[in-house]
A protein has these predicted regions:
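Perimembrane loop-to-helix junctions flanking transmembrane segments
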Residues: 36-46
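Extended, low-polarity transmembrane helix blocks
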Residues: 1-30, 45-53, 57, 64-139
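Conserved catalytic-core motifs of eukaryotic protein kinase domains, centered on the activation segment
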Residues: 33
Length: 139
């Protein structure tokens, strides 16, 4: 693979990650595209409900590449809380696959990376930066 494709691949990873995050949020809040397991409810105001709201609001922002760095940092924190508060408490805190927390760990570190690396070239953040650079006065 050519190294010059790395920025575009960063954008692609960001877009796919956001697509998955939106689904996680809509399942929590709306039972779509898959219903919650039988007997599972997420009360308004609960930690899971707050997570769903962060995912439904933050997901589209990440997908479009708007306010990418701060939103990705917040979502990395959300996923860390999800892991340590939700999954690690079930036991096997050092083994995320054993407590079904590995998606939260993967999301956490990918969002942390995106918060440092930025959105990539296929984003509204990048488009706005290019526009500002082209209209900046030359000194």
């Amino acid at each position: 693979m050519k190294r010059e494709w790395a920025p575009q691949l960063l954008s692609l990873v960001r877009i796919v990650l956001a697509y998955l995050l939106i689904q996680a949020g809509t399942i929590k809040l709306f039972g779509f595209p898959a219903p919650l397991p039988p007997g599972v409810t997420i009360p308004v105001g609960s930690l899971a409900w707050v997570a769903g709201m962060l995912e439904v609001i933050g997901g589209p922002l990440i997908l479009l590449g708007v306010f990418t760095r701060p939103v990705a940092f917040i979502l990395a924190g959300e996923m860390a809380v999800a892991y340590f508060y939700g999954h690690a408490r079930m036991g096997h805190w050092l083994w995320p696959v054993a407590n079904m927390g590995h998606p939260a760990v993967i999301f956490c570190f990918l969002f942390l990376y995106i918060s440092a690396a930025g959105p990539g070239p296929w984003s509204l953040d990048a488009r706005l930066a290019r526009r500002r650079a082209s209209t900046a006065p030359v000194s």
